[in-house]
Amino acid sequence: MARISSTQPRKQRKFRYNAPIHTRGAFLHSPLASDLREKYGKRSFRVVTGDTVKVLRGEFKGIEGVVDGVDVKNTKVLVHGVYVKKANGEDVPRPLDPSKIMITKLNTKDAVRVARLEVKA
């Protein structure tokens, strides 16, 4: 059965808000660096903890760090080195959107993930 899609922004926001967890994984894809793109023949791949990423947009642009965590529910990524100061001086991690970061080095500890990388689209 084909999924019916709408071009209305309110329905797109509603779809993302109400999406089940297994569908939200698709929202967590980030573009691959050019060397990884050539090696694996893929433009983007899902971000996991342990990947090395580079921030492409925002006030933290240019910072490169390891992914500390992935929030599937809110579709955000936590990167080591990307912090904001609270009023009391405490550093808290700043969640980033996966579309605003680029994967520069993949975490290849998971055999299933490596096998998925090798599959040509």
From Swiss-Prot:
Keywords for this protein: Ribonucleoprotein, Ribosomal protein, RNA-binding, rRNA-binding
Cellular component terms per the entry's GO annotation: large ribosomal subunit
GO biological processes: translation
A Pfam family: Ribosomal_L26
Signal sequence residues: none
CDD domains: KOW_RPL26 (cd06089)
Top-level taxon in the UniProt lineage: Archaea
Molecular function GO terms recorded: rRNA binding; structural constituent of ribosome
Family: Belongs to the universal ribosomal protein uL24 family.
Quaternary structure and interacting proteins, as annotated: Part of the 50S ribosomal subunit.
Protein task: One of two assembly initiator proteins, it binds directly to the 5'-end of the 23S rRNA, where it nucleates assembly of the 50S subunit.
Protein name: Large ribosomal subunit protein uL24
Underlying gene: rpl24
